[in-house]
């Protein structure tokens, strides 16, 4: 198979399918977004929001490091932290 075909297949593959442990974690984020977050209202002090950050961290870094990054971010999301722009670190 040519190199160009392999590259295009890699680019189009869904990153969550590569690691099945991400699926239940991403499902929990969706439950939070659609069931809990609307009841609480907009409270996140960060950009991207904590749920978006957690989703991106899981996809980019996998379930273990992604969870640690998400928990670290959630520990900063309180009234005594300034918040601001805090993107997911690159691999």
UniProtKB/Swiss-Prot annotation:
The keyword Isomerase does not apply. Keywords: Cell inner membrane, Cell membrane, Membrane. It comes from the Bacteria. Could be involved in insertion of integral membrane proteins into the membrane. This is Putative membrane protein insertion efficiency factor. InterPro entries: Membr_insert_effic_factor_YidD. It is a peripheral membrane protein. Pfam families: YidD. Coiled coil: none annotated. Belongs to the UPF0161 family. It comes from Saccharophagus degradans (strain 2-40 / ATCC 43961 / DSM 17024). GO terms for cellular component: plasma membrane. The keyword Cell inner membrane applies. It is found in: Cell inner membrane.
């Amino acid at each position: 198979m040519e190199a160009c075909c392999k590259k295009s297949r890699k680019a189009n593959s869904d990153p969550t399918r590569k690691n099945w442990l991400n699926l239940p974690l991403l499902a929990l984020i969706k439950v939070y977004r659609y069931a809990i977050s609307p009841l609480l209202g907009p409270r996140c002090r960060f950009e991207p929001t904590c749920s978006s950050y957690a989703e991106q961290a899981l996809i980019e870094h996998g379930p273990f490091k992604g969870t640690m990054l998400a928990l670290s971010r959630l520990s900063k999301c309180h009234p005594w932290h300034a918040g601001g722009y805090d993107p997911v670190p690159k691999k």
